[in-house]
Amino acid sequence: MNVQRELDFGHDDRERIYDYVERHGECAFADLETNLRVDPRGIRHHVAILRRDGYLEVDGDAIEVVFDDGTAEEYRDGEVEFVVRPAHQSDLTGLIGAIRQVAEEGRYIEAESVADVIDHEEVLLRHNELEERMFFVATVGSDVVGWVHVAGSELDKLQHTAELTVGVIDNYRGHGIGSHLLERGLEWAGSRGYEKIYNSVPASNDDAIAFLENHGWAVEATREDHYKLGDRYVDEVMMDVRL
């Protein structure tokens, strides 16, 4: 198991509180008091300690898990101004919408799967001793227009690897948003100790293959007729990059 995923809370009640927040993405103090077998008088103290130790962040009554993920970065390309930043639970609806908009083009099957998972779980970020999942988003104003997603493996022998998906909605392509998202995702993956990052796309998605190759990725393998898009069978192109 990666060192980064070994969590030490120092108290059983703190572990229960962290686990609850991590599973739900965001919660309020009232949720903890109602749903946990923890002395209500101690909850605010334990949250304060978890906040001090860098496990949780508190904004008003909202409690979220903390990732060591950096800050928002602003960019401009021509008339387009955008921000790349860590995703928050409040981005869930906009992020799912952006991923599904890209997936509807029928050329990014893995992205569609990611949208299904977070839509079902209703949780964006995961950080526990079995699973790690991070999103960064690109926003124009308050709208999510792109994302990068990094998810580690649950298997011990694959914990040096992580899957990455990245996408930008059609109207905002060509402004370097995808490149900034990819760079941010790979930086984060490297900081978490991952060594090999992989992605898979249909062979018909020439743009995605060229984009990744232009950023140092290589074709690792091809699985023939792996996807069925309508009446047509399409190969899966498996790509990776080493950090």
Question: Could you tell me what each predicted segment is?
Answer:
Residues 166-168, 174-191, 210-214:
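Conserved acetyl-CoA-binding loop-helix of GNAT-fold acetyltransferases
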Residues 2-5, 51, 55-90:
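Conserved N-terminal entry element of GNAT/NAT acetyltransferase domains
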Residues 39, 199-209, 226-227:
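Conserved beta-strand-loop-alpha-helix junction that forms the acyl-donor binding cleft
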Residues 113-169, 242:
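Acetyl-CoA-dependent GNAT
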Residues 30-31, 182, 189-201:
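Conserved GNAT acetyl-CoA-binding A-motif
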Residues 58-61, 198-200, 216-233:
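Conserved catalytic-core motifs of GNAT/GCN5-like acyltransferases
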Residues 24-25, 154-164, 173, 192-195:
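A conserved beta-turn-beta hairpin within the catalytic core of GNAT-like acetyltransferases
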Residues 97-114:
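Helix-loop element at the rim of GNAT/NAT acetyltransferase active sites that forms part
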